[in-house]
Amino acid sequence: MLGSFFFLAIISCVMSYINVDPMKSSFFLIFSLLMVMPLISFFLHVWFSYFICLLFLSGIFVILVYFSSLSKIGYVVTPFYFVGGVLSVFFFYPFFYSVTDVVAVNNFYFSVYWMLLVWVIFVLIFFMNFTSYFLNFSGALRKV
């Protein structure tokens, strides 16, 4: 059951990269958040999933405002979106079942969980690189 939620989350993330329209892309990102929430709620602290949900939704609405204000959005052909989706399934799927008691804010202070913190930073940098690539290097900031 949890695996199906994970696969739906990955599919909706891939669909958010395929769509050029900011509204559809934000919708698929919100759908991926809804599919990931059952996985995160099975970790040690349930409040952590609500915290992630609030941060993610506030970020999505900020991204939606900035992307919608862009005058032109360059369409970039993404030929390897299927390969990226399959690789992300194989890269992230074992993580959810091997680290179930680790995710808590207090656990980041101990030296045992530095690899988890490094992994989260790596995933965020990976996501930022894909986002800057699919924005066609135009940026989402307001022009002066």
From Swiss-Prot:
EC number annotated for this UniProt entry:
7.1.1.2
So where does this one cross the membrane? 1-21, 26-46, 47-67, 76-96, 108-128
UniProt GO cellular component terms:
mitochondrial membrane
Q: State where it is primarily located.
A: mitochondrion
Keyword terms: Electron transport, Membrane, Mitochondrion, NAD, Respiratory chain, Translocase, Transmembrane, Transmembrane helix, Transport, Ubiquinone
Which reaction is catalysed here? a ubiquinone + NADH + 5 H(+)(in) = a ubiquinol + NAD(+) + 4 H(+)(out)
- One function term, GO molecular function aspect: NADH dehydrogenase (ubiquinone) activity
How does the protein's chain sit in the membrane according to the entry? Multi-pass membrane protein
State its location(s): Mitochondrion membrane
Q: Reply yes or no: does the keyword Transmembrane apply.
A: yes
EC top class named in words: translocase
Q: Which family does it belong to?
A: Belongs to the complex I subunit 6 family.
Task: Write out the function statement from the record.
Answer: Core subunit of the mitochondrial membrane respiratory chain NADH dehydrogenase (Complex I) that is believed to belong to the minimal assembly required for catalysis. Complex I functions in the transfer of electrons from NADH to the respiratory chain. The immediate electron acceptor for the enzyme is believed to be ubiquinone.
Q: What protein name is recorded for this chain?
A: NADH-ubiquinone oxidoreductase chain 6
Which organism does this record belong to? Answer: Ascaris suum (Pig roundworm)
Q: Gene that codes for this?
A: ND6
